[in-house]
Design a protein with these regions (language model features):
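Conserved phosphate-binding and hydrolysis motifs of nucleotide-dependent enzymes
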Residues: 59, 87-89, 127
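Conserved acyl-CoA
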Residues: 91-107, 129
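Conserved short alpha-helix immediately C-terminal to the canonical SAM/SAH-binding motif I
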Residues: 92, 116-119
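Acetyl-CoA-dependent GNAT
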Residues: 3-82, 93-95, 99, 156-162
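Active-site acidic-Proline motif in GNAT/NAT acetyltransferases
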Residues: 80-86, 114-115
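C-terminal "cap" of GNAT-fold acetyltransferases
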Residues: 106, 113-117, 126-129, 135-162
Length: 162
């Protein structure tokens, strides 16, 4: 097997990125991301794209500053499925943490679904510690286009940023 090194950069996610991010979710999910871009314009959230040299997103995710006071809450984190377990998720989380620190905040939090042990293991490797559990739910689009309510249990995790 040959190893390939790809240079990555993190930047603000822009509306034009939606067309190349079908890998991250359904049309309903992408419509939600579009809504978050307006919140980013207002300074309520940061929404990031991790790109290779082509400037096409291979990962994306947000930091919400309105969930808890003095905390940046990471959410909607996703890495292109073909590129998972290559370090891109780590790059995304670290870029999000930098955004949090640039706002003068020192705590990052996130929720990870309990049926996603690989993601939880990543967050633990990055220094996140579980502190609670909480049910969560959202609408998702089925393959036939219909909407259904998705319900899950999440482990809440946090990290003190240096």
């Amino acid at each position: 097997m040959t190893n390939v090194v790809v240079k990555l950069s993190a930047r603000d996610f822009v509306h034009a990125d939606l067309a190349s991010c079908g890998w991250s979710g359904s049309e309903l999910h992408l419509a939600s991301v579009a809504t978050q871009l307006e919140r980013a314009r207002l300074g309520e959230v940061d929404y990031l794209a991790v790109c290779s040299a082509t400037d096409i997103p291979v990962a994306k995710g947000g930091v919400d500053y309105r969930v808890k006071e003095r905390v940046g809450t990471l959410w909607q984190l996703a890495v292109h499925p073909a590129l998972q377990s290559c370090g891109i998720g780590t790059f995304l989380v670290e870029a999000a943490e930098l955004r949090i620190m640039n706002r003068g905040l020192r705590r990052a939090e996130l929720g990870v679904e309990e049926n996603n042990p690989r993601a939880r293991a990543l967050y633990e490797r990055l220094g996140y510690v579980a502190y609670d559990r909480q049910p969560d739910s959202w609408h998702e689009q089925a393959p036939d286009g219909s909407l259904r309510r998705y319900e899950t249990m999440c482990t809440l995790m946090r990290k003190e940023l240096l």
